[in-house]
């Protein structure tokens, strides 16, 4: 997705340090950042925030972190958080490779990866969010019962991710090869998901854990 640069976005985000971490000021203090101590769920690559703000509104007993590196998108998440009055959702404007700088070992209960960039060229495989380098970070910050939820419309990325997770030592608790055909009504659509499902694109989904967590 091509993002149009918003020169004012950075200053806007910096005006709300209580909601947005721009430079690691809350690194290692994620639990303390919230008003209440509750389980923490993360969405990496939140886009415009429809998915995670909906989750936060539906589940006030869970604390949510939206992690998105594009400042020119993050402001839309911030707008939603303010408009909805969400006190259980914070935003990190940074790259996922910095996860272990922000979260303590075992601090996170769930990670969501929704419609991540597939990076289709083999030479870019290391950038995929299901590459083993990222899986190692997820394993580090997830607690013993923690899991990973993954959705994509890209069949190649889904197949790659299944293989990558299996090789890393993960097991799958749920796999959907056509989510919207099998959906029980609990699925929350992202902006991207709605756009492509309306065109008839198949959506793939999985839930996974690390074997060491059994």
From Swiss-Prot:
UniProt-listed PROSITE patterns: SAM_MT_TRMB
Pathways per UniProt: tRNA modification; N(7)-methylguanine-tRNA biosynthesis
Record's catalysed reaction(s): guanosine(46) in tRNA + S-adenosyl-L-methionine = N(7)-methylguanosine(46) in tRNA + S-adenosyl-L-homocysteine
Positions annotated to bind substrate: 121, 153, 190-193
Residues binding S-adenosyl-L-methionine, per UniProt: 43, 68, 95, 117
UniProt entry tagged with the keyword Cytoplasm: no
GO cellular component, one term: tRNA methyltransferase complex
Protein name, UniProt field: tRNA (guanine-N(7)-)-methyltransferase
UniProt lineage: Bacteria, Bacillati, Bacillota, Bacilli, Bacillales
